[in-house]
Amino acid sequence: MSVSYDRHEGMSIFRPPLCFELTGRQFRLVMDDGYDADLIFLDRETLLFRRAGEEKRCPYDCIKMEEQCYFINFEERPFKEPRCGVTVVLDEREGLVTVCFATLGKNPKLPRMPYTEFVFGAVEQPDGSVNPLRHGYTAEMAGTSIDWNYGTFNIAHVYQSERFYRVAFTPRALERIRRNSPEMMAGSDGRPAIRRVYEDYADFIKIRDGLFAVNLLETNLCRRNGHGNSLFFLMNLKEMHDCGRSFGTNAEGLDENYTFGAFGTRYDAGREMSLESMYYIH
């Protein structure tokens, strides 16, 4: 059983096909936090994850974004409390790995806002060696923006700086919203809600040239509406195609953890970048 449920297909129209190349293989992950892990792909649907004396058997999605580079997302089912989702970016060519741990319920004031932690590491080779290099945080994407097409809607992500992102809507996206979801055009104060510039925390990690892992949080949305998610992407900016996963809850309060994908085009977000932040002191 795939991690993704049928009800999420609208976000997954452009998701790359699931990859089964790792079936039957196992990897020893040497992690910088001192807790090494074993990642074992039992079959096309289930993996085993051993770490810090714990063993989890989980359904998973694996997506191949470049040759020998995989986006692997999993969480125990049925969901256990407190929830912990794991996403692994595995670069077999370079022997490097980045793991994103997403937990729910860590913040007592915002129990429906995920907390994310990144751990970097390397894949142990058959001779016992490990690559001394690591994936790392980067400023390469700062000052750029991309209009992402998810098939049913468009949204532009503005990578404001090394630590923040903003949301913008192109004229094409606004027209699609007017046509398909007119209720999104009006805010509670009478102003067009969709035209406000939303800003929040972000992490940008370089995996390879042109390939970036990006984590976008929705903390301000959670403060306003009671729930927000962690959106974690692996972006291939040479082909302008990404995959990702959404971890947290939906508007109905139901748990969710699913993978998706989009195609992107460069977008001039000079206006959105020039506006003073409504949320943070820069």
Where are these regions (language model features)?
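N-terminal glycine/threonine-rich, aromatic-flanked beta-hairpin/loop signature
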Residues: L29-I63, F153-A202
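Short solvent-exposed loop/turn micro-motifs enriched in small/polar/acidic residues
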Residues: F20, D32, G53-K56, E81-P82, ...
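Trp/Gly-enriched beta-strand/coil motifs that build multi-repeat beta-propeller-like domains
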Residues: V130-G136, G270-H282
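Hydrophobic, helix-prone linear segments
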Residues: M1-T46, R50, R271, M278-I281
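Long compositionally biased, domain-poor regions of proteins
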Residues: P59, F74-D91, T98-A102, V158, ...
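Surface-exposed beta-loop interaction hotspot
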Residues: V99-Y150
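Extended, charged low-complexity segments
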Residues: T219, M235-S277
